[in-house]
Every structure is written in C-alpha cells, then in structure tokens.
C-alpha cells in the first residue's frame, strides 16, 4: 500500500508579530490550494479556543472556504472537539460540509486536552471521556441517517434526524485523536482510526512504531485485519536543500511555536532533532526518515509545515520539496 502524505494546519497565532489573523487565514487557504496541486491527500485543520494556541475555533468554517477553492484534495477536521458541542449540531454541520465537498470530508474527532478550553466551555475534564463517547456514538448514528430518540447522561432528544445527509449517504471516515499508546489500543479495539501527533505522545522516533503496534493490537482483539487499517501520524516538517539550511530557515519559528504549546514538556529545535520526532532537514534526510516510517508500517503521514509565523514562501518551498523530491524517493 502506498504511503499517503497530507498537511495539518494548526493555525497558531502570535499577536506580537506583524502577521494578522486575516493574513494567516489567507496563507492557510493558499497553502491548501498548493497542497492540492502537489498531490497531497488531505488538508487537516485544527480546532482551538480562547488562546493564540490556535485561531480557528470552528474548522467547518475554514473547510467550507477551502471547498470553494479546491476540487480533489480531501478536507479534514483535526480535530472536532466533541466534548464541547451539541452532537446534533456537529452532525448537521459536517454532513452539510461533506455534501458541499462532494464527499471529500474527513472527520477527525477528539475529547480535548487544554485546561483553558474546558474552563471556557464550563466543561469538567473528569467527564470528558464519557461525554466524548456518548457524543461520538450519537454523531455517527445521525450521520448514518438514523432517526434517534435518547436520554443520555449529557443530552437528550425525543426525536432527531438529519435533513441533510453526507454525500451519497456515506458516513465520512472518522479518526480519533490520541495522546498515549494505551488510548491507541482502545481506539483500535473500538474499530476506530487514530490521529496522533508523536511530538506530544512519543518519547522518540522509534516509539512511533510502538504506538502503531498498540493500535494494531487493539484492532486484532476486535477481529479486524491489520492490513486494512488506516491512521494518521502528524510530524513537524521543514524541507530545504541541506540540514543546515533547514535549521537556518525554521529554527526560530519552530521555537516560537513551541513557546505557545501548552504541553507539560516543550521540545525546542535541538530537542526534537535529538529525539528524531520531526521531519526537518534536507531532501535526503527527510526521505530517509519517511522510509523508516514506511518500514514501521505507517500508512499516512500528515506534515505540519506552517508554524511559528514561518514566512509563507518558506512554507510553500518546503511543501513543494516534500511532494516533488522527497516522496518520489519513498517508493
């Protein structure tokens, strides 16, 4: 099976810099158009709230704009935080988006992990797993066209049925965000796909293979064939003509990006080069790491290339080198 490659846009904003939010939005839209022209599989858009950590609070709005600018590339939420939203509204919104895109929508979902977002939504972190599981089950059934009545722990309805279904009545592919190998196992056992960012979930590059193995172990326990699985591993990426040039171009932007990450551990440029959980470097360096991922059994890599207000021409140059010079070396 071919190794698929995509783009993940986290949409981090830095108010102290000259780039405005409208300018960031324009850059993101141009980068999606470029991704389509270069053959990237999917353009994923993050959801975040109440902080410059990410300034797209509703991926459906951004993805709707991208529907109008593209024809072929798949468009994904990464992720829709089901914990914070009414499941009926989520199902309606993304069914309509999938219909408008002609079936190109990819549904990344998660439960959230940032304390300030739970505070802003007056949501209890201790309830997030139960709330997520309840909402995901409802959203999936609504997208499938079922007429539902329910009395849940977190919501209820006498009767709900979508009046707009996804394209051709097909439920979009669903990916569940995970931050730990134990979660990867359970997602696999529940017959879901995983979406993960190894920066936040793995201790080093080889640990990516460990997480993938846990996911496949869960699938096996559910009686699913491993060679049928699908998953997304997202890696920070910058490709240049040499390793030194890559560092010169993106180190400052990457470290600025890391400064706004609200993780317990923050890996600066030197750290992420040392632990290997990135795709920074020359065409040869990045191609070698992509081959290692392929040999681990990874099937789908999302590249996070716009971070820290990196100059858009450098983002686009990296995207082009990755697609035109790195990927042909992987076959």
What name fits each language-model region?
Residues 5-7, 43-45, 75-77, 105-109, ...:
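Hydrophobic faces of well-ordered beta-strands that scaffold small-molecule active sites
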Residues 1-75, 172:
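N-terminal beta1-alpha1-beta2 module of alpha/beta enzyme domains
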Residues 11-26, 80-88, 168-179, 240, ...:
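Active-site mouth loops of central-metabolism enzymes
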Residues 53-77, 131-135, 319-331:
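Alpha-helix-loop-beta-strand connector modules within alpha/beta enzyme cores
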Residues 1-3, 89-192, 206-213, 221:
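Internal, glycine-rich beta/alpha segment that forms the wall or movable "lid"
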Residues 42-66, 81, 113, 199-203, ...:
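Glycine-rich, proline-tolerant flexible connector loops at the mouths of alpha/beta enzymes
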Residues 7-9, 37, 126-161, 204-299, ...:
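An alpha-helical appendage that flanks or caps ligand/catalytic pockets
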Residues 35, 39, 47, 66, ...:
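Conserved, mostly hydrophobic/aromatic
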């Amino acid at each position: 099976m071919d190794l698929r490659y995509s783009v993940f846009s986290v949409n981090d904003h830095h108010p102290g810099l000259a780039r405005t939010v409208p300018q960031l939005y324009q850059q993101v839209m141009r980068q999606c158009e470029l991704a389509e022209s270069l053959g990237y599989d999917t353009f994923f858009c993050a959801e975040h709230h109440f902080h410059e950590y990410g300034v797209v609070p509703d991926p459906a709005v951004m993805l709707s704009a991208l529907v109008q600018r593209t024809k072929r590339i798949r468009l994904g939420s990464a992720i829709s935080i089901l914990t914070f939203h009414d499941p009926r509204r989520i199902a309606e919104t993304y069914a309509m988006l999938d219909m408008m895109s002609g079936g190109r929508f990819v549904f990344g979902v998660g439960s959230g992990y940032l304390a300030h977002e739970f505070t802003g939504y007056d949501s209890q972190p201790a309830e997030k797993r139960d709330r997520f599981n309840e909402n995901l089950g409802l959203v999936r059934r609504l997208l499938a066209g079922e007429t539902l009545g329910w009395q849940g722990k977190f919501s209820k309805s006498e009767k709900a049925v979508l009046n707009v279904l996804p394209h051709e009545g097909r439920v979009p592919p669903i990916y569940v965000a995970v931050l730990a190998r134990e979660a990867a196992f359970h997602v696999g056992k529940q017959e879901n796909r995983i979406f993960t960012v190894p920066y936040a979930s793995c201790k080093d590059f080889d640990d990516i293979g460990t997480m993938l193995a846990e996911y496949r172990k869960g699938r096996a326990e559910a009686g699913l064939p491993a060679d049928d699985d699908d998953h997304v591993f997202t890696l920070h990426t910058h490709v240049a003509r040499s390793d030194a040039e890559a560092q010169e171009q993106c180190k400052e932007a990457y470290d600025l990006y890391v400064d706004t990450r609200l993780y317990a551990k923050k890996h600066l440029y030197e750290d992420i080069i040392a632990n290997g959980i990135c795709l920074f470097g020359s065409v040869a360096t990045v191609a070698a790491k992509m081959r290692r991922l392929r040999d681990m059994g990874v099937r789908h890599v999302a590249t996070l290339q716009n971070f820290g207000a990196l100059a858009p021409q450098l983002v686009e140059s990296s995207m082009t080198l990755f697609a035109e010079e790195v990927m042909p070396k992987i076959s």
